[in-house]
Amino acid sequence: MLKQFLCRLKGDNEVSPVHTRASGTTEFVLSSNGNKLHYRIQVNNVRKLTQVRIHIGPAGKNGPAAAYLFGNINPGISINTGIVTGNITSKDLIGPLQGMPLSKLIEEISAGNAYVNVYSEFCTGGELRGQIDPIK
């Protein structure tokens, strides 16, 4: 059975809540061999989007980045609705997970200890955030 995860992105989820019209979701599907994590990010009403990253940390606390999903670009791009897709492998892991197998990231996600953060030029600390949860 495939492992799937979902993340709902909202400004209210930031450690210091952000009042924004922006929103989004991120969906993840782990490959059957566990070596690749496919993702699909959809963001809405983001002005000057610069990057999207997975971080290690529980809800309500900031933690270190573990993988880039988009960017870092400068200047940022403004979009009404945008979709980014890609794959993460162990080679893409950074920070505390650099050099480790992808299974370490999956362990953090499964434990509720990973989140997606969306950054913009206007909210350099993060405009949207959401914990990554297993789809049951």
Predicted regions located by residue number:
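Metal-centered catalytic cores of metalloenzymes
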Residues: 1-52, 56-136
